[in-house]
Amino acid sequence: MKRLSSLLSIAALLLAGASAFGQEKPPAWAYPVNPPDFKVPPDDGTPRKVPDSNVALTLTQVRDLFFSPDWHPADHPAQPDAVGRGRKPDLYACGFCHRADGPGGPENANLMGLSANYIKQQLADFKSGVRKSSVMNRAPMTLKVKLAAAASDEEVSAAAAYFASVKPRSVIHVKETESVPKTVVAAWYLVADPGGGTEPIGERIIELGDDPERFISRDARVTFTANVPPGSVEKGRQLASAATGTTPSCDACHGAGLKGNGDIPGLAGRSPTYLFRQLYDYKHGVRAGPMAAAMIPSVEKLSVADMIALAAYAGSLTP
């Protein structure tokens, strides 16, 4: 009886542990969700401007899902319709979320310089449902799924070729720090709390736009500071360069300096918050598809701290 009782106790502990793992919640800092009472500020009609641009746009215009605010059209090739205007009623302009030439932000992907085949595969995965997110009720995800379902093959090909043609550039500064501004969620990303104050960074990445008003205006030249825990970049470098018997180093697949390798995407200089979400989604089985098989063995044993470090390291590199 004592042996049976001990076995039952062990089984109960194992089940409790498995249940706790199954109920693990995705980190709120990585998957910001607007609070229930969140409201966008009203448009007072004042024209908005950004540096080095003669364009003037209102808040209503920069919030239009069927419009890509193009403050600096000389920075990139001509936008295809799918990127610049979309197609009503349900094909939103790619450049609305990802910005005019694709740098995106912490809330979504940086598309600059990704291979056209990779971009097309991701849209196919969103459309088929094999690529999901650990938090599905975020607008960046729901809009992407709806767009992928609505886009024709020709529209997908045109958008993919456009973003693939854009040369990647640095938009991220990774900063190791013990304290960060207190933050609130605004439109699916973090901003400094208007009330001010700081707090320990803990086990988080706190990525903020360097000019919040330009970010609201969807200026593709806006830059970001990704605050990460001290030691993250070096820890990430060591993790990225380590290879085991079953898992290659990161650059074995993603190329030297993590700049990409054919249809395998470059990771260098991309949003650490976004990269963390992808690692987390792979580990928890919600991001699947043809390219997932190679990633799953690489992430299955990573802790949250490991994923933060890898994302910080990749984000710190020159694209």
Protein language model regions, located:
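Sec/Tat signal peptide C-region and signal peptidase I cleavage site
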Residues: 18-22
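Extended intrinsically disordered, low-complexity coil regions enriched in Ser, Thr, Gly, Ala
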Residues: 112-141, 268-280, 284-293
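Cys/His-rich metal-chelating microdomains
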Residues: 100, 256
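Bacterial N-terminal signal peptides
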Residues: 9-17
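Flexible coil segments in periplasmic/lumen-exposed cytochrome c-class electron-transfer proteins
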Residues: 23-92, 134-141, 145-249, 284-319
